[in-house]
Amino acid sequence: LLYAPFLFDDAEQADYIYDTYLTDLYRDLLAAQNLHLLTWYEIGFQSVYATTPIMVPADARGKRFRVSSSLNARLFAEAIGADIIPLGFGEIVSSLQTGLIEAGENSVSLYARTGIADEAPHFSLTLHAFGVSVIVADKKWWDALPAEDRAVLTDSFPPISESRRLSRAQDLSDLMDPSLEIVVHPLSDDQRNAWRVASIDVTEQLIEKLGGRARDIYALILKGKAEYQGNQVNPEL
């Protein structure tokens, strides 16, 4: 659900919602699976890469579009009318070279320096899905550790604010690096809105297919978005 298209408007809004609501919630959800959440690791916003420019969803219609095994990836590709090609990450470069695929979606960190950019240099900043991963430990093992050892392990990771800053700085640096020869395509508001409109039903589809607490989590995210917007309007509150 957290990868639903346009679930978050920007990174700062996502930061607020993760810090205020989602971290505690997912710590509890993971604990129920005998996992202890150590920290989040930001992957970054996903955008669309391709061998030729894809500026609006109509440009992606019928394109051989690589998707991962995740449900959100398949539903997004269906929504924009792409020809869906499920592939593992390690198959992307060779599939671009042979023409099996023409496009796909990924974050800058998983695109710029992995060989994908060499074969599909056009990168359109749809910024449609905010990616994160988690670093976890076996909870039974974690709970049995002395407090001092838990503190050492926790402190071995940089503060989330610092890891976010470094990740975003690296993404920007990669996109601007002339040696990578990435053709970055910023989108106008109208172009980006076209992606939003095309994928507008995906979140509800995800909620229905995922079941469980997905709808409650979505409601919590909407609450966080409203709070964040209110804080921007009334920053003194």
Where would I find each of the regions flagged by the language model?
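N-terminal secretory/targeting leader peptides
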Residues: 1-13, 22, 30-237
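Phosphate/pyrophosphate-binding betaalpha-module
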Residues: 25
